[in-house]
Amino acid sequence: MTNSIGIHFNITFIGAGNVAWHLAPTLKDAGHHIVQVYSRTVESAEALATQVGAQAVNKYEDVEPTSHIYIYALTDDSLQWVMNHIKIRKGLHIHTAGSMPISIFKQVRDNYGCIYPLQTFTKEKRVDLRKVPFFIEANNKESETLINDIARCMSQKIYRLSSEDRKELHLASVFACNFSNLMYIYAEKRLGRKNIPFDVLHGLITESVNKVKKIGPRAALTGPARRGDNRILDQHISLLHKDPEWQEIYTLLSEQIKKM
């Protein structure tokens, strides 16, 4: 995506994980200059820095205080630690965490906010950010305008959301993405015991997602618990006798489905 705002910023990335691997190249392609990539692991910093033509640093004292924007693409635990060690007050400081309030910056930065891309990222699979929803927040109007401009270099879907509401969004995302993926992992494990390839479920998964998108999750819900088919439910619970934790999960989820 081209840089529609007509201004090029010097940007430093703090963190070189999955989120940084998507945001940094996209911002570079939009015309911004990625100055530095910091990671406590030098190999991680160098790998991303090479991709975006930046300097790699792995010591917090080597992070230059001259960038316009600092993007903290870190885990929640790492964010607090890094902020206490990289003591740069100038510039605009932006974290990308769904569950962290922007007030984490309050005592140590003057201008700050959040850009939260609602997507699951891995380095191995590049995501087209243009249709990924980005949720932004800032501590003042000037910072919000700048964060909005930066976000629009990456996505067409920008929303303003408070820290409290972003926590709810993050929680919902865990249910929709992480927990569903856990179910896929267990399904793969069960199939593997019988030498059945997981890809036999691909069509089912795709159709389920398509129906959810078209008619909504409640209307798309099917299966024995939805039908009240207790014979099948008892059969499944019996099959899970060697996995008591999953037997409990199956029972609990089935009871929740019955209440829908």
Predicted segments with their positions:
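Interdomain hinge/lid region at the active-site interface
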Residues: 206-260
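Rossmann-like NAD(P)(H) cofactor-binding subdomain of soluble oxidoreductases
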Residues: 42-46, 50-126
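Phosphate- and divalent-cation-binding pockets in alpha/beta enzyme and binding domains
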Residues: 22, 47, 81-82, 104, ...
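Internal alpha-helical scaffold of NAD(P)-dependent oxidoreductase catalytic cores
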Residues: 44, 48-51, 111, 126-168, ...
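A structural micro-motif
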Residues: 9, 32-33, 54-55, 91-92, ...
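NAD(P)+-binding Rossmann beta1-loop-alpha1 motif at the extreme N-terminus of oxidoreductases
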Residues: 1-57, 127
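Amphipathic, non-transmembrane alpha-helical scaffold segments
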Residues: 38, 71, 173-176, 180, ...
